[in-house]
UniProtKB/Swiss-Prot annotation:
SUPFAM superfamilies named among the record's database cross-references: YhbC-like, C-terminal domain, YhbC-like, N-terminal domain
Name of protein: Ribosome maturation factor RimP
Function comment: Required for maturation of 30S ribosomal subunits.
GO cellular component, one term: cytosol
Lineage: Bacteria, Bacillati, Actinomycetota, Actinomycetes, Micrococcales
Signal sequence interval, chain numbering: none
InterPro entries: Ribosome_maturation_RimP (IPR003728), RimP_C (IPR028998), RimP_C_sf (IPR036847), RimP_N (IPR028989), RimP_N_sf (IPR035956)
Length: 162
């Protein structure tokens, strides 16, 4: 079975841009292509490779220039397009171990595979699962298989203290 043109394009873009992101010390989180009037919009989402921290605007600008140059050199996208390079943002669902490692120290809400919800501070994340100090004060360990998804809660007070 031959992949659709869109699937093939996304695969070529990912193959092209993963090493570009890695060369900038970043992780290629996602690539999407969508119509934008007479053009196409190429959205590239980059993140730090692992662990807590924030991707600075200067680093993102440098990576954006590297992505743009790679796209121009490879001529993978035919016709005019608009390039958008961004980070996942705080509303990204936490679905992979790397996402949880990136959110260490943050307040999170988890939806467990059993359907229940747990909120608390994400203390750590390792290869086996995550360790959360719940709102009730207990430290609980969850295996990744037991967590359907998670999300970071924006907390202004915590940012002001840190």
């Amino acid at each position: 079975m031959t992949p659709s043109p869109d699937t093939a394009l996304l695969g070529r873009l990912r193959d092209l841009l993963e090493p570009v992101a890695a060369g900038c010390g970043l992780h290629l989180e996602d690539v999407a292509v969508s119509p934008a009037g007479r053009r196409r919009r190429v959205r590239v989402t980059l993140d730090l490779a692992d662990g807590p921290g924030a991707l600075g605007s200067n680093d993102l600008a440098d990576a954006s220039r590297a992505v743009s140059a790679a796209l121009d050199d490879a001529d993978v996208v035919t016709g005019p397009y608009v390039l958008e390079v961004s980070t996942p943002g705080t509303d990204r669902p936490l679905t992979q171990p790397r996402h949880f490692r990136r959110a260490q120290g943050r307040l999170v809400t988890l939806t467990l595979a059993a359907g229940t919800h747990v909120s608390g501070r994400l203390l750590s994340a390792d290869d086996d699962g995550i360790h959360v100090r719940t709102d009730a004060g207990a430290t609980t360990t969850f295996a990744y298989a037991d967590v359907a998804t998670g999300r970071v809660e924006v907390e202004l007070r915590h940012l002001e203290e840190g």
